[in-house]
């Protein structure tokens, strides 16, 4: 009996430590950006400044204006959220985590019209950047990144 009690305590403590382990909370930033070559009208936001060089190389534009954004802290990896601006909105539905990336269902709307619906993987190591439609003399750019 004396041997069984320590063994039972050891088994239960291992079971609780394994079962009670949870994923660390992480915040995802989502941004709707208008990229243009017009003169700057306002300073570039900090989130955009982090990847401004990449955006310039990818799209060839020199100015980036943040028109909508959202931050969501992921606790289970299966949350959803909305980043919106006056005319565009991005609905993000996180479907869980696989191999150091979040699996996302993305829907981009212009007012009520669905423009894009896709599945994507958001790596924890690098941002997800999507070229959107032409807007005036610029381009809509969608950025999601784990902070």
Name each region found by the language model.
Residues 6-17:
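Bacterial N-terminal signal peptides
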Residues 21-147:
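Outer membrane pore-forming secretion/assembly proteins and partners of Gram-negative envelopes
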């Amino acid at each position: 009996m004396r041997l069984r009690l320590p063994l039972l305590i050891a088994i239960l403590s291992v079971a609780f430590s394994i079962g009670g382990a949870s994923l660390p909370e992480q915040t995802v930033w989502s941004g709707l950006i208008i990229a243009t070559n017009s003169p700057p009208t306002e300073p570039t936001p900090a989130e955009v400044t982090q990847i401004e060089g990449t955006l310039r190389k990818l799209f060839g534009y020199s100015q980036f204006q943040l028109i909508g954004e959202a931050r969501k802290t992921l606790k289970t990896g299966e949350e959803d959220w909305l980043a919106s601006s006056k005319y565009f909105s991005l609905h993000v539905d996180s479907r869980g985590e696989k191999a150091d990336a979040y699996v996302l269902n993305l829907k981009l709307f212009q007012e009520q019209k669905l423009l894009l619906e896709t599945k994507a993987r958001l790596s924890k190591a690098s941002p997800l950047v999507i070229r959107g439609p032409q807007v005036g003399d610029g381009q809509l750019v969608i950025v999601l990144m784990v902070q």
